[in-house]
Structures are given as C-alpha cells and as structure tokens.
Regions:
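A subset of signal/propeptide-processing and intrinsically disordered low-complexity segments
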Residues: 9, 13, 191-192
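Sec-dependent signal peptide hydrophobic core
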Residues: 16-20, 24
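N-terminal alpha-helical membrane-insertion module
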Residues: 10, 18, 37-38
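N-terminal Lys/Arg-rich, disordered targeting/topogenic segments
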Residues: 1-11
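Intrinsic-disorder/low-complexity signal
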Residues: 24-208
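Calcium-binding loop positions in Ca2+-binding modules
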Residues: 12, 16, 62
Length: 208
C-alpha cells in the first residue's frame, strides 16, 4: 500500500478546507465594513430633565400637561415634539389605556404624561396642567394632580407639586424654572398660564 499517496491526498483536502475558511472570514469582514452599524440614538439625544404628571389611575378624565419655553415654543398634545421638548403620549384617561389580545380587550389603568427636555441649553420654562374634559365620567371631579421635575443625570428630584383641578377647562400653573449654564436649575415665583393665556385653538397640530 502506498501510504504516501494517502498522506498527500489528506494534506490537499486540509489545504482546501483552510482556504475555504479564510475566504469565508474575509467575506464576512468585508460585509461588516460595507454595512456599518448605525450609531445608537444618533438622531435622538437622551433626556436631561423629565416633567412627569400623574393622576388617579382609575379616573376617566382627560388631563393635559403643557410646557412653554422662553422662545415661545409650546409642547403639549397639539404639538408633541418641538425644540428638544417631547411629550411621550397624550393620555386620555382610560380611553387609550387598552390593548387587544386574541381573547379580549385588556385595560391597564395608568394615567400619566411625561415631557422630556433633551438639552441643558440655558432656557426658562413654564409648566401648567389643564383639565381638558371629563367625558368618560361627568361626575368625576375634582382631580388631584401630581407633577414632578426630575434631573436625569445625575438623578435628582428637583421639585414635586400637587394641585387640584375642579372643573373642565381649568388650567393651573405648576412651576416656572430656569436651566442655567452648566445645567443648574433655579425656580421663579410666577403664576403664568399657557392655554388660557394663548388660547388652545391657536396652537397648531404638528405631527411628530
């Protein structure tokens, strides 16, 4: 038996296998370089401050959170994303707290609205809350509202305010604060309103 011939054959097969592995690796490397992974959240800077409003989870009333800066940029349900201010969701009481499964419709009672401020640029802000309507439960008044101002990084609770809204169309001032150079926040005494000062109808609807 010519054992050298078999050794030569096995060596040739090993060489072909190694070449195949090498070409496969080079192909995968070239594919990765041609299609680089997109930078995460390159289009959406992280939040620096959060304004969080919550009210009775079982309430059917529609309460709205509004913010206005010193450049007259107004963010609320009509204009949800403007000047690095973003309202995450227009909570309508229990009317949009539902989701559908294969079996039925589930209700998750959470009444909460959050506005993100995605910049530490020096600006001054006014925050208000507005009783839009109580169509879901005409007798459900008054409404106890809690509003928090949080700094995200480093995490700090800057202010917590509780107000009571008694009837639809009522608006209450929550706080007036200013972001200074470097990110420090100071508060001002004020009773400025947004909706009742500007007129809700004058704020145009803007798609996100």
């Amino acid at each position: 038996m010519d054992t050298n011939r078999y050794k030569s054959t096995f060596g040739f097969v090993d060489l072909l296998f190694n070449l195949l592995v090498g070409f496969t690796f080079l192909f995968m490397l070239a594919f990765i370089l041609i299609n680089p992974v997109a930078k995460k959240e390159a289009h959406d800077p992280k939040a620096e401050y959060l304004v969080i409003m919550s009210w009775d989870d079982n309430s059917k009333s529609d309460i709205d959170l509004w913010i206005k800066d010193d450049k007259d940029n107004i963010v609320g349900f009509r204009s949800k994303d403007l000047a690095l201010l973003t309202l995450d969701r227009d909570d309508l009481g229990d009317r949009n707290d539902m989701y559908t499964t294969k079996e039925n419709v589930e209700l998750v009672p959470v009444n909460r609205e959050v506005i993100s401020i995605r910049s530490k640029t020096p600006r001054r802000y006014v925050v208000t809350t507005h009783f839009y309507n109580n169509l879901g439960d005409p007798d459900a008044t008054p409404q106890n509202i809690k509003i928090e101002l949080l700094q995200v990084n480093p995490y700090r609770i800057l202010k917590i305010v509780e107000v009571v809204l008694v009837e639809p169309s009522q608006e209450k001032h929550v706080f007036d604060f200013q972001v200074l150079t470097g990110g420090e926040v100071i508060f001002h005494e004020s009773d400025q309103l947004i909706i009742n000062d500007v007129a809700l109808e004058s704020i145009p609807y803007m798609d996100r």
